[in-house]
């Protein structure tokens, strides 16, 4: 039996990690770029958020983390568009460099504690009672999801979508694809860093390894969401990413309740992503065999 506390925790974490799913929805699905900056950008958001919160500015930490994440996305885009480095390799290079940057932000310490510091959650606790973590996380995620959906309907947003669909056609239309890719990656990593910033204040700690495997977690949430919302408008796909993240956290909660070792969670995530991405190939391989068996 899953307790109320476990359900609340799954909802809270699902809303927080949904920002990563939305970020990957923009980079992986809209721009069609496998951005490997995600892990480092998430930790960067954690580091910036914790450092500024400890200094006494927990709310200022959120836009600051987003700005830092956007800078990380800009570097990846610069490597990709100006230096012509393949997108995956560009993300890996940026992610590797961010390890040192994140350590520097945290004062060359592997973790930062916020036990004695105010957070965005502790500030609203007197007003929201037992929902002081869920409501801010849910509202923030919904607002970001709405803003992303509205942005993708603007002229620039449509240009970004077109760049992911057919970059050659976009270039023929005199649209600067380097600019659209840069904007897309900056926004994507800003959302990832915001997720890390909120998680750091949620846990009241930031650790250099918090972002490890985040791209897999985000992809798992995104793909689960696409299963829930396979077709539809942009807002439905964004909603699917959010719901997928929440459902993923419930899957993890159930796995922990079944006494599965916590070390196995990353493996479970990897298997979910591999099966979901490879599902079309599996279906096409099974159908001919089934028809042959009937014949």
Predicted regions and their residues:
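Single transmembrane alpha-helix segments in multi-pass membrane proteins
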Residues: 4-57, 78-83, 223-231
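Loop-to-transmembrane alpha-helix initiation sites
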Residues: 13, 88-89, 115, 133-138, ...
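Alpha-helical transmembrane segments within multi-pass membrane transporters and channels
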Residues: 24, 57-96, 141-145, 244, ...
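Short loop segments and helix-boundary regions at transmembrane helix junctions
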Residues: 31-34, 74-119, 124, 204-208, ...
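Helix-loop-helix "hairpin" substructures at the membrane interface of multi-pass membrane proteins
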Residues: 72, 130-210, 215
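Cytosolic-side transmembrane-helix boundaries in multi-pass membrane proteins
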Residues: 165-172, 176-179, 232, 236, ...
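Transmembrane alpha-helical segments in multi-pass inner-membrane proteins
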Residues: 192, 196-267
